[in-house]
A protein has these predicted regions:
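Canonical Rossmann dinucleotide-binding motif of NAD(H)/NADP(H)-dependent dehydrogenases/reductases
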Residues: 2-34
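Conserved glycine-rich Rossmann-like NAD(P)H-binding loop of the short-chain dehydrogenase/reductase
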Residues: 31-46
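Conserved mid-core segment of classical short-chain dehydrogenase/reductases
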Residues: 99-104
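Rossmann-fold scaffold of SDR-type NAD(P)-dependent oxidoreductases
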Residues: 12, 89-97
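Structural signature of beta-strand start/N-cap positions in the alpha/beta core
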Residues: 8, 32, 62, 88-90
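Generic hydrophobic, amphipathic alpha-helix propensity
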Residues: 18, 43-46, 50
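Conserved amphipathic alpha-helix within the SDR
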Residues: 47-51, 61-65, 70-87
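Amphipathic, non-transmembrane alpha-helical secondary structure
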Residues: 20, 24, 28, 44, ...
Length: 104
């Protein structure tokens, strides 16, 4: 298996569900992770939970709000993550989803 220790990752849709589990595993394996979600409250809660659970500081995990349907949010996420993670991104997990506005 690929050694992710000291790698840098962005995970969209990481405040809950599979995205949160991906983040948890990468943090357990020593990866620095930038969490991202449209839900700011849940995102910050997830960040805090991981910091307490794994004894991590602000240098190991961050949260950036991102609506993946908005190009400017992607730009802000990428720039913030590279700055926080102090280098290029090694892993990108696009977990956030979009649903079409359809009336049933």
């Amino acid at each position: 298996m690929y050694d992710v220790k000291n790698s840098r990752a962005i995970i969209t849709g990481s405040a809950q569900g599979l995205g949160k589990e991906f983040a948890k595993r990468l943090l357990q394996d020593g990866c620095k992770v930038c969490l991202s979600d449209i839900d700011i409250e849940k995102g910050l809660e997830t960040k805090s939970q991981f910091q307490k659970q794994f004894g991590l500081g602000d240098d190991a995990v961050c949260f950036v709000k991102c609506d993946v349907s908005i190009k400017e949010d992607w730009t802000e996420l990428w720039e913030s993550a590279e700055k926080f993670l102090n280098g290029p991104i090694d892993i990108l997990i696009n977990n956030a989803g979009l649903f079409p506005a359809v009336s049933y």
